[in-house]
């Protein structure tokens, strides 16, 4: 199963981007043994609309256009389920085993995700109840993807 990330907004060069790249490289190297492949990070421009609802709607249209055919969509949102790393790895592994071709994890813009898009997602997940800057969300997501692969492969990186 290919796993990709769609993110509204760009991650500038610097230590945060380097750390994201390091975890995604680890995922890309470890994933194939578990039947997982990293496709890419697709960065979309932020809407310049004057109000939040319009910005979220415009960004949702861009997100939808960027998705492959019939992907499993995981939306990151503060209203989502709170899972531990094992639950996330199990979810990824189960869908891979069912023959899903693509999973896309979506990070919304500064205003969050459009409610209609969020409601259509296959899974809405949060990375904790606190508010996180985009750079840290990307780092945490990249690390959790790598951790999921290590859990699925029985690698000792994850210690439960």
Curated annotation (Swiss-Prot):
Alphabetical UniProt keywords: Cytoplasm, Methyltransferase, rRNA processing, S-adenosyl-L-methionine, Transferase
Cellular component per GO, a single term: cytoplasm
Main location: cytoplasm
Domain of life from the UniProt record: Bacteria
Subcellular compartments: Cytoplasm
Enzyme class: transferase
EC numbers on record: 2.1.1.177
GO molecular function term, any single one: rRNA (pseudouridine-N3-)-methyltransferase activity
Region listing for Disordered, in residue ranges: 44-63
Reaction(s) this enzyme catalyzes, per UniProt: pseudouridine(1915) in 23S rRNA + S-adenosyl-L-methionine = N(3)-methylpseudouridine(1915) in 23S rRNA + S-adenosyl-L-homocysteine + H(+)
Binding residues annotated for S-adenosyl-L-methionine, in chain numbering: 76, 108, 127-132
Annotated family: Belongs to the RNA methyltransferase RlmH family.
Known function: Specifically methylates the pseudouridine at position 1915 (m3Psi1915) in 23S rRNA.
NCBIfam families: PRK00103.2-3
Subunit structure: Homodimer.
Protein name (record): Ribosomal RNA large subunit methyltransferase H
């Amino acid at each position: 199963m290919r796993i990709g990330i769609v993110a509204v907004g760009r991650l500038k060069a610097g230590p945060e981007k380097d750390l994201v790249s390091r975890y995604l490289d680890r995922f890309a190297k470890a994933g194939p043994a578990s039947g997982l492949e990293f496709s890419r990070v697709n960065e979309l421009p932020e809407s310049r609309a004057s109000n939040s609802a319009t910005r979220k709607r415009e960004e949702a249209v861009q997100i939808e256009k960027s998705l492959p055919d019939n992907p499993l969509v995981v939306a990151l949102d503060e209203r989502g389920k709170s899972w531990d790393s094992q639950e996330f790895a199990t979810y990824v592994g189960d869908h891979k085993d069912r023959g899903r071709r693509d999973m896309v994890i979506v990070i919304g813009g500064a205003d969050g995700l459009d409610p209609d898009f969020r409601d259509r997602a296959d899974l809405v997940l949060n990375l904790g109840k606190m508010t996180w800057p985009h750079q840290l969300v990307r780092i945490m997501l990249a690390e959790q993807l790598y951790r999921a692969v290590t859990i699925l492969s029985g690698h000792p990186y994850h210690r439960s």
